Structures are given as structure tokens and as C-alpha cells.
A protein has these predicted regions:
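Conserved pre-ATP/AMP-binding loop-to-beta segment of ANL
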Residues: 1-9, 16, 39-45
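Conserved AMP-binding/adenylation subdomain of ANL enzymes
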Residues: 28-45, 55-95, 109, 181
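Conserved beta-loop-beta connector loops within the AMP-binding
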Residues: 170, 185-204
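Gly/Ser/Thr-rich phosphate-binding loop
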Residues: 93-98, 107-170, 183
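Conserved AMP-binding A3 loop
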Residues: 5-29
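Short beta-strand->loop structural element characteristic of the AMP-binding/adenylate-forming
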Residues: 1, 18-21, 48, 71-78, ...
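Alpha-helix capping/helix-boundary segments
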Residues: 80, 102-103, 131
Length: 208
């Protein structure tokens, strides 16, 4: 269980492309905890829109989390909004993951085109970049589903909002650490923890 299971692409803290080794136990603990967080079960239908080699679509909870709970994974090979919306409508997709730039296009389309039936969608995860408050609010209004924000690194701890959080909370933060054992603090250049509201470097440690 401590053997390397996957070499996952990451920009890490430097932005320079690299491969991050993830172990079997790490992937299982992470995907299982996230699937519980998203209330996944055998009725879950997850649409993989983003690149599968990325941690977001692969196991946040993504493909791995869905399969752990006995759900169904639908893989999308075209991110064009029309193709995606038709798959959601046809397959009755109830959870998927996007980046803010993609969600912005969805909102722009849905503001003038209400011909798509997206009522099956219950959870929309958004991560990879900051999410504008206006886009988050519009997404809740037009898609009528729960928005979940994510923030984290391929190599380490991830934070996310709860499905029960208010729209105000979802728009103002990236949530809390996924696991109770996760530790996160912000330090200055000397490694000393900074006060709330101050800028610093994020340090994170998890149980895997």
C-alpha cells in the first residue's frame, strides 16, 4: 500500500512542470474521503470533463471516488458546452468538475439559452483558479445545484467547501481541509506562523 501507484503531473509550488509520485494508500484515503464529502453512492453519475491525468478529475473524488462507491463514470472527449450539456442531459449526470474559465462560458450560454435540461446536476465542483463571486452566484441561480470550491496541490492536502455551506461561504473561501488529520498553516520567510489576514507561505501536512 506504500508503493507508488501513479506519477501525476503537477506544477507544484514553483509552476515548473514535474511528476508527483502518489502512493496507493494516499490515493485511496483521499478519494474515499472526498467521495464521502460529496455523498457519492451507486446512483452517482460523474462526468469527467477535465484531463484525467490531473488529480481533480482523477480522484477529487473524480473517477476513482465514483468507482469506489459503485457509481458510473462518463468520460467526455469534447469540452464544447453543447457537447457537455447534451451528455449531462442524456446520461442524467449528477456531479462533475470544471475550472472557472469553463464555468464562465457555461454561464454566458445559459443566460440566453434555456433549451438544455440540466436538472439532474446536483453538485458542480470548481477549482484550479480563483472563482469570481458573480460567477459562483450565477452558477447557483442558473444551474440550481450545489457549488463546491476546491483548493490544493497534487502532492498534498486539499481544502474544499461543504455542500451544506451557504452561497456567501462558497464565494468567500475555498473551505476547510478535507481530512481531520490534515494540518495547514501560513508562515513568514522565517517559518513563523503569521496572524490571520497576513500574507505568507502555505505549509500543509496530511496523514498519508
Amino acid at each position: 500500500k506504500s508503493a507508488v501507484a501513479n506519477l501525476m503531473l503537477s506544477g507544484g509550488t514553483t509552476g515548473f512542470p514535474k511528476l508527483a509520485p502518489l502512493e496507493y494508500e494516499q490515493l485511496y484515503v483521499y478519494a474515499n474521503a472526498f467521495s464521502e464529502k460529496c455523498n457519492m453512492n451507486e446512483d452517482t453519475k460523474y462526468l469527467a470533463i477535465l484531463p484525467i491525468p490531473h488529480k481533480f478529475a482523477f480522484c477529487s473524488p473524480g473517477i476513482l471516488g465514483t468507482l469506489l462507491k459503485g457509481g458510473t463514470v462518463i468520460v467526455c472527449d469534447d469540452v464544447n458546452y453543447d457537447s457537455v450539456f447534451k451528455i449531462i442531459e442524456r446520461e442524467k449526470v449528477n456531479i462533475t468538475s470544471v475550472v472557472p474559465s469553463l464555468l464562465k462560458i457555461w454561464i454566458e450560454v445559459l443566460e440566453w439559452d434555456n433549451s438544455y435540461n440540466l436538472t439532474s446536476l446536483q453538485v458542480l465542483q470548481v477549482g484550479g483558479a480563483p472563482l469570481e463571486n458573480r460567477i459562483a452566484e450565477k452558477a447557483c441561480e442558473l444551474l440550481k445545484c450545489k457549488i463546491q470550491q476546491l483548493y490544493g496541490a497534487t502532492e498534498s492536502v486539499v481544502c474544499c467547501t461543504d455542500l451544506s455551506d451557504s452561497i456567501e461561504t462558497i464565494c468567500s473561501c475555498q473551505g476547510k481541509p478535507l481530512l481531520p488529520e490534515d494540518e495547514i498553516k501560513i508562515v513568514d520567510d522565517s517559518g513563523v506562523e503569521v496572524l490571520p489576514g497576513k500574507t505568507g507561505e502555505i505549509l500543509a501536512k496530511g496523514p498519508y
